[in-house]
Amino acid sequence: MQPFFIFALFFFFAIAYNLLGPLVTSIMETNNLTLSQSGLLVSLLQVGALISLLLSLYLIKKLRQTTLLKIWYTVLMVALILIGLTSGNALLFFLYVAIGFGAFMIDSGSNGALSGDYFEKKELYIPLLHFSYSAGAIVTGYFILPFRGAAWRTAYVVAGIILALLLVLSQIIKPKEGAIAKAEAPIQTESNLPVLKSRNFILYTLALMLYMGSQQICATWIPVYTELELLQSPAIVGTSLTFFWVGIAISRLLSGLILQRGFKPLPLTLWGFLVAGGALALLPFASNIVLALILIALCGFAAGPAIPLYIVETSSWFPKNSAFIAMVYIIAGTVGRMIFPYLTTRLAESTSLGYALMVSSIMLFVAGVLVLIVKRSGRTERAPR
């Protein structure tokens, strides 16, 4: 599959995956869901991802990443369209498991395909891939505007149809034969045991898990916080999510350029976590919506490139294990997104969403400490640079 279609599909995958945040109040109203029940939808995404993980452990040795991408995009498209054509809470919960099932391999497969098949361009392609995700998430806040209220299911159908059209086009429009041969050449792999035995890899992955849990909390609950506690209009609610993802998108786009100028991923990640944690901790104390939006954007911007920086850095430690590293990153994200957003809703029900967001900033500070340990251990271990 050409990189262009990997980026384009990932853009609309981001829209589909992030529909819950700006539509959650509409879903709660039409389906009579409580705050914790809507938080369960986020956890069910990760349950589907874990099921997909178990299957991928077998398939990753049998099929190429691009083949798996086509399969899981099909699963995602079917689930999205069925959400729009069916009704009932039980079926909605089941289909969210299916979305998580497809999303796991889409995320892992896209990163694995680019960092493996296009290894020589990974420092450019990986940040661009995650920029595509951020750009899609930015558009989500406005994509859903015609579908708020009782028409929220239509947004899922439209997203599914667009993904289907792009997938068909990716099979019709092929690169030149020479380019295909280069992209599809088998990638030599080594044992994954050295990766799992690396203390630095484990600590860095734990830091990423905390960040991805925090990112999911922000992406899901910042719009709800803006609407229910800051009492803002639907347009401002959508803008709050947009500011978060604009910050992420800009930093991810810049990270590719910064890396090419010789900057190292670990220091960038460390300072990003600390600044983002500070911005999130200050958010509940914002005296007006303008200051709140600035803090939201800063939170997204500072920690935004953490995922592509992680993949670029760890792939340089273990260049022949890129597919496995991509899978581990998704596992870490799955655990973080499963546990922490749900705990946030439980805390919010007994206090407030603003307080819960402030407490979740601790996750970013802890992640920063873990990255600092990895960075300092570079004096004695081979991996960190």
What residue spans do the PLM features occupy?
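C-terminal transmembrane helical hairpin of 12-TM major facilitator-type secondary transporters
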Residues: 263-310
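Cytoplasmic helix-loop-helix junction between adjacent transmembrane helices
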Residues: 95-131
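Short hydrophobic/small-residue motifs within alpha-helical transmembrane segments
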Residues: 45-47, 134-135, 245-246, 334-336
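Extracytoplasmic gate region of multi-pass secondary transporters
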Residues: 20-21, 199-242
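Helix-to-loop junctions at the C-terminal end of transmembrane segments
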Residues: 52-64, 252-264, 348
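Helix-loop-helix hairpin linking two adjacent transmembrane segments in secondary transporters
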Residues: 120-121, 128-175
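Conserved MFS/SLC helix-loop-helix module at the cytosolic interface between two early adjacent transmembrane helices
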Residues: 51-88
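Helix-breaking motifs and short loop linkers at transmembrane-helix boundaries and internal kinks
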Residues: 32, 64, 85-90, 119, ...
